[in-house]
């Protein structure tokens, strides 16, 4: 911002002390500091706004390129779809002209592509059955709680009995 060294600051302070006087100098210094802070904040806000506008311009350019790419893909897809539709219609019209009804003979179905592939079915294990299959002696050794008990009931159960 402004390049002011220590000697220049001392000179400015001495001149201000002589011109303004010792009584008004602290108030003037506070006012100058406040105004300088406001100026710095204003400059920072302007910089941020310029950066934001530059980023928005870049984003708009990116958006335009993405939109043009999407339009190109959509156009190519439409052309391929229309070509496929024309080929399909010509193929079905040829089949209708030859008298082929579209039903294949069983001999044509034989081959590797006609095999039925079974689908995977998850076994659907029941977690209750798994837990009950664990032996009780193992649960006792491992410290697995089989009965739920509240905290107060547990304290009452393990509290030493009073002597009478």
From Swiss-Prot:
<dbReference type="GO" id="GO:0033281">
    <property type="term" value="C:TAT protein transport complex"/>
</dbReference>
<keyword id="KW-0472">Membrane</keyword>
<keyword id="KW-0812">Transmembrane</keyword>
<keyword id="KW-1133">Transmembrane helix</keyword>
<dbReference type="InterPro" id="IPR003369">
    <property type="entry name" value="TatA/B/E"/>
</dbReference>
<comment type="subunit">
    <text>The Tat system comprises two distinct complexes: a TatABC complex, containing multiple copies of TatA, TatB and TatC subunits, and a separate TatA complex, containing only TatA subunits. Substrates initially bind to the TatABC complex, which probably triggers association of the separate TatA complex to form the active translocon.</text>
</comment>
<keyword id="KW-0653">Protein transport</keyword>
<dbReference type="Pfam" id="PF02416">
    <property type="entry name" value="TatA_B_E"/>
</dbReference>
<feature type="region of interest" description="Disordered">
    <location>
        <begin position="81"/>
        <end position="102"/>
    </location>
</feature>
<protein>
    <recommendedName>
        <fullName>Sec-independent protein translocase protein TatB</fullName>
    </recommendedName>
</protein>
<dbReference type="GO" id="GO:0043953">
    <property type="term" value="P:protein transport by the Tat complex"/>
</dbReference>
<dbReference type="InterPro" id="IPR018448">
    <property type="entry name" value="TatB"/>
</dbReference>
<feature type="transmembrane region" description="Helical">
    <location>
        <begin position="1"/>
        <end position="21"/>
    </location>
</feature>
<keyword id="KW-0997">Cell inner membrane</keyword>
<comment type="function">
    <text>Part of the twin-arginine translocation (Tat) system that transports large folded proteins containing a characteristic twin-arginine motif in their signal peptide across membranes. Together with TatC, TatB is part of a receptor directly interacting with Tat signal peptides. TatB may form an oligomeric binding site that transiently accommodates folded Tat precursor proteins before their translocation.</text>
</comment>
<comment type="similarity">
    <text>Belongs to the TatB family.</text>
</comment>
<keyword id="KW-0813">Transport</keyword>
<dbReference type="GO" id="GO:0008320">
    <property type="term" value="F:protein transmembrane transporter activity"/>
</dbReference>
<keyword id="KW-1003">Cell membrane</keyword>
<keyword id="KW-0811">Translocation</keyword>
């Amino acid at each position: 911002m402004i390049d002011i060294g220590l000697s220049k600051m001392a000179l400015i302070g001495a001149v201000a002390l002589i011109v303004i006087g010792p009584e008004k100098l602290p108030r003037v210094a506070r006012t100058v500091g406040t105004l300088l802070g406001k100026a710095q904040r204003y400059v920072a806000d302007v910089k941020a706004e310029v950066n934001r506008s530059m980023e928005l311009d870049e984003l708009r350019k990116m958006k335009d390129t993405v939109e043009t790419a999407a339009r190109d893909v959509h156009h190519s897809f439409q052309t391929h779809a229309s070509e496929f539709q024309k080929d399909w219609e010509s193929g079905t019209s040829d089949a209708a002209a030859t008298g082929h009804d579209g039903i294949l003979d069983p001999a044509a179905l034989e081959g590797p592509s006609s095999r039925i592939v079974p689908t995977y079915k998850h076994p659907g294990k029941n977690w209750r059955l798994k837990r009950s299959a664990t032996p009780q002696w193992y649960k006792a050794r491992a410290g697995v709680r089989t009965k739920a008990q509240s905290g107060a009931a547990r304290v009452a159960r393990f509290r030493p009995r009073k002597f009478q």
